[in-house]
Every structure is written in C-alpha cells, then in structure tokens.
Amino acid sequence: MLFLLVVAHAIAVLIFGCGFFPQKKVLDGHAALDGTHARDPVFDKLVVVVVDAMRSDFLFDASISKFHFIHEKLADGSAWGFTAHSNPPTVTLPRLKGITTGSTPNFLDAILNVAEDDTSSSLLAQDSWLWQFRNNAGKRIRFFGDDTWLKLFPPVEANEDSQTMFDEYEGTNSFFVSDFTQVDLNVTRHIDRQLRETSEWDVLILHYLGLDHIGHKDGPYSRFMGPKHEEMDSIIRKLYDELDMQSTLLVLMGDHGMNDLGNHGGSSAGETSAGMVFLSDKLAAYKPSKEQSSAKEFPMKIPSLNAGEEKTFHYLKKIQQIDVVPTISSLFNVAIPKNNVGVIIPEFLQLFKDVSLQKAIVKENWNQLSGLTKGKTQIMEETKNFVIEDVIKNMKDVQENLAKTATDYNYPLLFIGCFLSIVITGTIYYRYARHVAININTSILIAIAALMGISVFGSSFIEEEHQFWWWIITGLVLLSMVNLNFSSWKSHIIVLFCLRLIRGWNNSGQKYTYDNVIANLLKGNIDALWWLNLITVTVVGLNLKSLRFGNHTVSLLGFSDLLSMGLLSMITFLYKVNWSIVNGERVPDLFYKWVLETASLIVEDATLYREEDLIHTALIPLARIFFKLFFAVLVSRLMIQKFFQVSDISKSLAVVSRYVTIFLVFQTPSHNIGLFLFFEIINEITVHIIRERYQSDYLLAVIFGIILQFFTFFQSGGTNSIATVDLSNAYNGVSENYNIYVVGLMMCISNFAPTIYWSFYNWRITYANANSSRWQTLVAAKYPFIIIQSTIGCCLLLACIILRYHLFIWSVFSPKLCYYMVWTIFVGIIVHWIPEILLLLT
C-alpha cells in the first residue's frame, strides 16, 4: 500500500507537470510577402556558423578572447558585433528553435525534444527562415555539425511527409562532452569542398561543438579554450577570404553562453549572453551601432570589477537573439516566419537605401508581431506617417509582452495534480501517525519536512537549498553532543570535521561561486588529487570490516568478495586515470605508466599504435570490462547467496552496498572521488554512535541517512538548476551507437551518486536489529523519506500555482519542479524501493 501511495504521488506530480509545462500553441501555415514593395535581396548567399556556448566575452573581451580576425573586422567596420540575449532554458535545442523560427521556447523544450501541437519532434511543418528560404526563395541549403539540427529538420528518410530541408548534411553527436577535437574536425573537413562548390549551394550552416565540450569539461577559463578560439577564428578567416563577401553574409553566433563552471541551462548573465557577429565587405560602407562606433579598440578592455560586483557580459549593443530571424528574412527578401517574436535589428535597415522600403520592412515586422497578440495591437495599413524609431520601440514592448505570455497553463491539470498530491500526502501522514509514537525523532522528522516545505515558496531559498541541509546536519550532530562528557566528543568532532570538508569541496548553490574550493585546489595539484583518489578507491574496495562472516562457507564467500572488489577497484582507478589522460589532463607519471601497460594488454595489435592513440583506444574497452565484470560478479554473488541460503540479510545487504559503492565511484568525476573517503569515515563513526548511544535506533539512522542524501547531493556540485547537470560520466563505455535510455540512466547515477550511497546507510542498523519481518522493516524505513518528499511536493506544487506569474517562475521554480520529479521518480522509487525489494526477494 505504501509503495502504491508513492507511485500515486509520482503520477500526481506528473499530471501537474503536464499542466504546468503545456504544449505550446503555434500558428499553423507559413507566412508570405504582401508583394506591395518589390525588392531584391541584399545578399545572395548566407553562411551561418554556430559555435556552441560561445559567450559574448569569448568574442569581445581582451582578457579572454583569441578571435583575432574577428577583432580586425570589427575595427574596420566589415563586422558588426552584438551581445545576443538568449532566453532560458539555455540549452541547444530550444535555442536553435528560437534562432530558426523566432519563437520563444517553452521550458519543456529543454527536456522533451520539441513539443508542438502536432506532437512531432521536428520543425519541418512549422514556419522558419529555413522553410522560407527553401520553399519560397528556392534556396539550396547544406548543413554540417550538431545533429540537433537534424532532429529539428529531419532528412527525408526520417520523416513521413517527404519534405527535407537540407540538400546535403552530416550530423555530429552533441553529447560526447569528452571530445572537443574530433567533433569539430568532422565539421571542418567539409569546408574545402563547399568552397569549391559555391555555385551548388545558397545557404551553408556549420555548427561546432568543441568549445561547449571544453566548457563542460574544464570551464570557460580552461587552457584548451584559447586554442579553440583561434581554431574557430581561423575557420571564419578561411570562409571570409575565399567567399565573395560583397554578396555573402556570414553570421557567427553562439546559441547560448555558459556560467563560470562551464555549464548552461539556467538564466545567469553568462548563460544568457551569447556572442553574435555579422560579417560582409558590404557592411563597411554603413554605420555599425553607436556602441561599436564608440569602442576605442578591439578586443575591448573592460575595467576590473569592484569587490562584490558581478560581470554583466554586456558588450557592444545588446539585442535579443531571436532578432536575427526577421533580420535575415528581410535581408534575403523572404517572409518573416509566422511565430517570430523577434524585431529587426535597426542598424540593418540602412542597407535598404529607400526610406519607403525601410518603412515597408518595419511594417511587415509590426504586422507579423500583431498577428500573435490576439487583436491587442492593430494591423498597420499605411507607412507614410510613422517614425521608424518609434515603431521599433513599440515592437520591443510587444516583444517583451509576448515573451511573458508565451505559455498558457492548463489549469484543470494543475488543480487535479495539486489536489491529488495533498490527498495522498494526508493519507501518508494518517497511516504514519497510526503506527509511530510521537518522540524526539518523529518531531525532528516533521520539523525538517515542514521547514523544507515552507522554503520552496522563496526563490532564494530554492537557489540556496544546500544551506538548509548544512545547518540541519550540523545541528543534528551538535544536538547529539548534548550531555556527553568531553572524552566522548571525539567521534562527533571527527564527523563535524569531515562534514566541513565536504561542505567546502565544491561550489554549491546558484548565487555565489568561490575559486578556492577543495575540488579546484586538487585540480591544481595532480599528485594530491590522484594519490587521494587511489587511497579512496582502495578503502572503498577493500573494506574488510563488511566482509567478516561466521562459518567456513561464508568466509570463503567473503574472500571471493575481497578479490572481486579489489579487481573492480583497480579497474575503476585505471579507467579514471585513462579518462583524464584522454581529456587532456595531466596525471602522475607512475599512473600514466600503469594505464599504458593496461592499454597494451586490452587493445589488439597494441604495438601498431602510438602511446597517445593506444590510451585513447583503450578507454571504451576498459569501461566495458568494468561493467561486464561488475554485473557478472553481482549476479553471481546473489545466486550464491540464494544457493547457500545465507540468512543474515544485513550482512548480505552490506556486501551488495560495497559493490554498488565501487560502481558509484566509477561514475563519479575524478575531483569528487575523494568525497567517498570522508563518506566512509562518517558512515563508520555514525553507525557506531547510533548502535552504542542510541541502541540502534532505526528511525534516527533513517533520518540521518536522508539528510546526508540531500546534503551530499548539493555539496558534490548539484543544485536546483539544469546548468549543473553533469554529462561527463553519462557516456562511460559508450560508443557513438548508444542507447539514449542507458545514457539517461547513467547520467542520473552519476549526478546522484552521493545520494545513492547514503540511501544504503541505514541497512546495517535497520536489518541487523529488526524485530519484525523483512517487509515490515522495509516499510518502516521508507516512511521518513516519503514524509519529507510528499510535504515538499505539496508545498512546491502550491508555490508554482500561487507564484505562476513570478519573475523567476521559469528560471528558478520550473527547474526545481523538474528536479523534484527526478527526486520523486528516480531516487524515491527506483533507488529507494527497487534494489531493496529485489535483494529481499533473494
């Protein structure tokens, strides 16, 4: 019954989510020019180069930018630069949707491909400048780069209506964040042939991923970032030098930016500030923006920030990224897409020398926007008596209002989901109250649930949720020290010391970042990092204490566990070192030699490879060896346990948890592996304290474990922002032909590894001293997490309804709701219930 209530609550949250993230309504059909003002296109060819995650300062700031050719062109006026604001969610798919259709993306676009009225994942049937170029202007389009474009505009064999947008194409995979070299070379290798065949295409689109991958891997100030800037700059130079730039418009843009950790998806200034540059010889004859005209030099030297002052990433003129859509449409004389919310960039109007033509273009943009306002603005019939600047200002106001009202909530689903959540939570509380007496532990549980529930009504509390769990965990340890003599404090002091180290390991929360966190210090000292990792892996894999058994048969089983865990730990360490080498990180020479020797053993014809290539080649096979061995050993262990009828369930669960811990370390970033050493210390000490001082109080163990699940999730770098989702370990052992569901599961395991570790914490106490059946023990241990989660859920759903027009509804509350869904389904059901049920059945 309790499990059914948990599933029902998850369904209620999903129902609410369907109402909160509804499919966005779009206008059907395609726009057409009114034909009243005939004009020729300003340019004949268009080249669009998208550099994924190219933040504005990467292009314009003297302290970081290496785009030397772009700087030359900005200085002589043949390049016009802008800071392009990209609306959140700042991930590639919704941003490409905005860049091509001019529409504001729904937040759900960051999670579900593209959800439109026809429930299709493509934009083939929706109006876009690509559709206009292809169908109304007869342009031939070629594309090479991020295969997200091919999801939006699938080739003919992938769609039923036999439409296709690209005459020639090749996609590169966008999620192998470890690769920032080959992924770009796979795009660049097409350029020479395209330059030879300029008569056979009109539009060329290139989308480079390497810079984004460097950001994810090593942050915006990585040592690889400068060379990548220069590589991208050389590509622009090559295109510019070999194309006819009088008749060609070259647009260089980022689809979004990145934060100071190198991630994106949120709404920080760095994530929403993408660079954009238009290049053509023709532009030199006209005036750029006044901000560019007044700039003294390129790249721009920005004054140092004062203490506490945040970087704005505002360079030159700031525009909306979607403004590129009506601008390109007008310059190439095609209709502005029906669902466009962009406003033509005013500086480009001067390329139309006839003032009446400029007014006609502005009128087209105004009337197109008016079609989206549901009659709130009037269609413009005449162009004689208006001032262009005034109309553009009014269009900006319309744009702002349209962006705010882009989503219509499905209120019936919102209220049904919220009502069900409240009813189910009330039922859970009622059932819990019938079985549990009120004492200090239950009071602490209810207080934590109430505190965390109330906190979701504040946007800052959501952004800094880690602070709550820090004070809760330290408060609980300090409370345990009350009435203890000084000599008994030692173990508590050690726990507090370990907690403080964990607290300072990574940047946590969304408001503040610090340079000197432990993870960054370790990255700067490779010897300390890797020796700590070796010690951690050894401690995790060779924890002899959990392998002590009574009789001869089980002792033999324990010895086999010791060998298996030792082998898995060794492979884990070698793989993490190998992974770091492949990603351009330095490692101690000794460990480099170990990896090289290992690679020579597992790669066929190893003597034919250079050292570097040999290590690269060994990466995926080494990971697959680990996975095969892990699952073979785990299944064998459970079968042997069943065969020999090992009755001590607590010991069996402890051994299984050791195997899973090794797997979690394997899925953890190198700089976070050391956390598990302190997890182990806290685990051993607190289990001893609960057994000795609290007579193995299972409820206290469960509550303490839950707090640590949340606390360590945030202190390992997690937040309530999509920007901190780590993909770097989602592809361990995966080649290009991957299963998205497997990768998704691996991503969840990687990001929630500390949480999964502490979900097993109470097993050693709960099952070792159980006075009731296994199943009654299981249910009793699950109530506290369900109490906390359901309380938070009820409050969060209410907060999303009450604050649905809040300024931060999409940047703070929506990501929190998405994270809550993951906590409910992945952690609350998959992690908390399924493994334990399967183990109890054996």
From Swiss-Prot:
It is found in: Endoplasmic reticulum membrane. GO terms for molecular function: CP2 mannose-ethanolamine phosphotransferase activity. GO terms for cellular component: endoplasmic reticulum membrane; plasma membrane. GO terms for biological process: GPI anchor biosynthetic process. Pathway: Glycolipid biosynthesis; glycosylphosphatidylinositol-anchor biosynthesis. It is a multi-pass membrane protein. Gene3D superfamilies: Alkaline Phosphatase, subunit A. The keyword Transmembrane applies. It holds the Pfam family Phosphodiest. InterPro entries: Alkaline_phosphatase_core_sf, Phosphodiest/P_Trfase, PIG-G_N, PIGG/GPI7, PIGG/GPI7_C. Its main location: endoplasmic reticulum. Glycans are attached at N186, N441, N506, N551, N578, N771. Keywords: Endoplasmic reticulum, Glycoprotein, GPI-anchor biosynthesis, Membrane, Transferase, Transmembrane, Transmembrane helix. The chain crosses the membrane at residues 409-429, 442-462, 468-488, 524-544, 554-574, 615-635, 698-718, 740-760, 783-803, 821-841. Ethanolamine phosphate transferase involved in glycosylphosphatidylinositol-anchor biosynthesis. Transfers ethanolamine phosphate to the GPI second mannose. Belongs to the PIGG/PIGN/PIGO family. PIGG subfamily. This is GPI ethanolamine phosphate transferase 2. The gene is LAS21.
